[in-house]
């Protein structure tokens, strides 16, 4: 969706990845081989406290999960998700959550294979 996503170039992607890795409020795991980044998962703890509708809880939120296109289907994403599950358990989080775009059918299928289920839907109307 070009109306939402920025155009990515190799130089701005590298800068974005370094900014993410250096963000102290986030947990970043990087899969690499021969100093080349194959995939990255970015995690953040979200605490839900005194919400009008929701019970108090602690969630490990996946902000980003990206695997290099040439290295997809090799189990890298699965390894990153499994490590996120371990971190969530160690941090005593109740759930591991993420957002996924409806049009990204491959990602939806991947996340379902990892045991995730759809929880809610974000709707929009263009103005």
Question: Positions of the model-derived regions?
Answer:
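Conserved GNAT-fold acetyl-CoA-binding loop/helix
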Residues: 1-17
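A short helix-loop-beta-strand connector motif used in the catalytic cores of GNAT acetyltransferases and
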Residues: 15-30
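Conserved acetyl-CoA-binding loop-helix of GNAT-fold acetyltransferases
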Residues: 64-67, 73-86, 113
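Conserved active-site alpha-helix within GNAT-family acetyltransferase domains
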Residues: 78, 82, 90, 102-120, ...
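Conserved GNAT acetyl-CoA-binding A-motif
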Residues: 88-99
